[in-house]
């Protein structure tokens, strides 16, 4: 029995939209092996020229497809199409991920740009312009600011806007006729708003505790009264006490006891801060002069600075507890007046900062 060797055409990569090219190669292979058994299903009709048919199919020209073409098209193309669809879906997924990352990068850049504009406005207000130049030391702080701190400043700006809205709402309600249930809802919302600020500060302190401690996110007049990144609870109670009238004897006693407890807690935190400053100074100053390398001192100082975040959180916890205790001592209407007075107090400090900055820019 004579065995004719079959010459296989090397496979060639073809696309879904090139079905006839591969079929042409298969036909050429069968044509070159004429002594090979050929099934009747793929016999080329006698009235067609094999050479011209092969040439037409290899160039993708239209013709009457024979049964083999139909079988190959139906049996081979679905797998190719499914693979191509899967590749397209994967490419689309990666494209969406790249687009999402790009949008996030744009948003971060936008936040940084807004913050730089705010810092520039703040520099103008605080008189950092000298002639036609800018004090770059005052603004160098912005260059190294992390995206987390930029996001905090944006959040704090929205927080102040919401506080102003709540103040207007409380003022309107207290001058009108409203039920205690509606008033209680406004008081609870205002309390939650302050608690939200404490959570925001706690997250920001983990990123840059010096930024929170310095109060750079507040106006200059607010920074003048700053105590461990915020207001001093005992002093604030002293300012707000006249707005609580009329108070019962028991309420007055409770408020005085609360203020005394706040003073004791504030003294303990202040003493802890002084001790931390003392130990931090010793850590930085340790070592011999002229060593050139400060790595051991910096490592020790960094470990001690971790306690600074705890001080900020404890101070905010004291503010949180003071507000809650005042809410417990006062009636709903008294608490609403107290929150209104507290909000207006901060509004007046911000207005004082703006007025002082405007006075500095006036010609003498």
UniProtKB/Swiss-Prot annotation:
GO molecular function annotation: DNA-binding transcription factor activity; transcription cis-regulatory region binding
InterPro entries (UniProt xref): bZIP, bZIP_sf, TGA_domain
Basic and acidic residues: compositionally biased ranges: 48-79
Tissue: Predominantly expressed in roots.
Gene Ontology BP annotations: DNA-templated transcription
Entry keyword annotation includes DNA-binding: yes
Localization per Swiss-Prot or TrEMBL: Nucleus
GO cellular component: nucleus
Region (Disordered): 39-79
PROSITE patterns, per the entry: BZIP, BZIP_BASIC, DOG1
Span of domain DOG1: 149-359
Annotated stretches, region: Basic motif: 80-100
Official protein name in the record: Transcription factor TGA4
Species per Swiss-Prot/TrEMBL record: Arabidopsis thaliana (Mouse-ear cress)
Gene that encodes the chain: TGA4
């Amino acid at each position: 029995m004579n065995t004719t060797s079959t010459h296989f055409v090397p496979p060639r990569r073809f696309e879904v939209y090139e079905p006839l090219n591969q079929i042409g190669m298969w036909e050429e292979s069968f044509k070159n092996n004429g002594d090979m058994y050929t099934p009747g299903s793929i016999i080329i009709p006698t009235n067609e020229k094999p050479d011209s048919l092969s040439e037409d199919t290899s160039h993708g020209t239209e013709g009457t497809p024979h049964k083999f073409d139909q079988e190959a098209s139906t049996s081979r193309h679905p797998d190719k199409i499914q693979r191509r669809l899967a590749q397209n879906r994967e490419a689309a997924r990666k494209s969406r991920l790249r687009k999402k990352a790009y949008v996030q990068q744009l948003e971060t850049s936008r936040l940084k740009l807004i913050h730089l504009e705010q810092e520039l406005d703040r520099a103008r207000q605080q008189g950092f312009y000298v002639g036609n130049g800018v004090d770059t030391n005052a603004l160098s702080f912005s260059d190294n600011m992390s995206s987390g701190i930029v996001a905090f400043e944006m959040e704090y700006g929205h927080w102040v806007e919401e506080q102003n809205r709540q103040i207007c709402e409380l003022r309107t309600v207290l001058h009108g006729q409203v039920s205690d249930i509606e008033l209680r809802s406004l008081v609870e919302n205002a309390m939650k708003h302050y608690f939200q600020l404490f959570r925001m500060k706690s997250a920001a302190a983990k990123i840059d505790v010096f930024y929170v401690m310095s109060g750079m996110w507040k106006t200059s007049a607010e920074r003048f009264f700053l105590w461990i990144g915020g207001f001093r609870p005992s002093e604030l109670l002293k300012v707000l006490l006249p707005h609580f009238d009329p108070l019962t004897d028991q309420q007055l006693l409770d408020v005085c006891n609360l203020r005394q407890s706040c003073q004791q807690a504030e003294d303990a935190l202040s003493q802890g801060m002084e001790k931390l400053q003392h130990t931090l100074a010793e850590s930085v100053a340790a070592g011999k002069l002229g060593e050139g390398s400060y790595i051991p001192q910096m490592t020790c100082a960094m470990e001690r600075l971790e306690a600074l975040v705890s001080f900020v959180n404890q101070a905010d916890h004291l503010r949180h507890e003071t507000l809650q205790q005042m809410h417990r001592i006062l009636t709903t209407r008294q608490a609403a007046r107290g929150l209104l007075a507290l909000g207006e107090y901060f509004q007046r400090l911000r207005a004082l900062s703006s007025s002082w900055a405007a006075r500095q820019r006036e010609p003498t």
